[in-house]
Amino acid sequence: MNLMKRSLVPLMTAGTLLLTAAAPAPPDDGKLRIICFGAHPDDCEIQIGGVAALWAAKGHHVKLVSVTNGDIGHWREAGGPLALRRKAEAEQADKILGVTSQVLDIHDGELLPTLENRRLITRLIREWKADVVIAPRPNDYHPDHRYTGVLVQDSAYMVTVPFFCPDVPCLKNNPVFLYNPDSFQKPNPFQPDIAIAIDPVIQKKLDALDALESQFYEGGANGYPELIPTDPAKQQERHRQVRAGFEQRAQNLAHRFRSKLAEFYGQDKAASIHYAEAFEICEYGRRPDTEELKKLFPFFGE
């Protein structure tokens, strides 16, 4: 893999500007500004694709950032060509959701919680003038996932410090920082502070995940040739299986966090919710009460 990576350096260099170009900050129009960080060009879409679509439908500004370029996330491809392919996939997925997409040019599998990367994340949060920041918890099987969580945690206070990254104006108010759910139990399990019904947008989320073909239809880093059918009927069945898997995942979250859904929607409405996403408040950001959470997730009167 090192030899392959070296042979593709010129291609990576050619793609650097494309991979790192930042979208302009949203206008000051009174709408919410949400930025989500994932380790790879599929993580944000899996974790918050439903809520992102709900926010976007109301005109709020949502940005999904992949902290690495995903350039080793396939069993058959790697380097610059894969990075550019995954960037294009993420952009298509995020277009379906109605949100802004950005893929940073850091090698997949090589993310570290350095000062340079802390500054990078801090600048991105400030430039978006975020009200809400979402990231994985720093307890995970994948080092890129862990360090994405650490980097966002480490930015939670620094975004308000004027002379840290003084080239970008600091935020006057610390955003609300939220964690995505996971199933890891040690040192402590995920504890939801809010759960959101995504029934109205579940098909849109599945359509967005459809666009990430290298990961979900070709198997990503753990795929193999037999996983990719050539017969049209089998291809259609493969797509059906992948969509059904993600649909089941959203159903499992609704079942797992049914009591939290009831807190926000009431028992009767919660019992009828089929699909959900959930979030835990990070203690290092602003600590919203229930009323502020309802303003940040303005979906409960629907």
Name each model-derived stretch.
Residues 74-77, 188-192:
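Short acidic, glycine/proline-rich loop/turn micro-motifs
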Residues 27-28, 163-166, 171-173, 184-188, ...:
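C-terminal accessory domains and tails appended to enzymatic cores
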Residues 89, 151, 155, 204-211:
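Amphipathic alpha-helical segments that form well-ordered structural scaffolds
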Residues 50, 139, 183, 285:
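Flexible, active-site-proximal loop/turn residues at the rims of small-molecule/cofactor binding pockets
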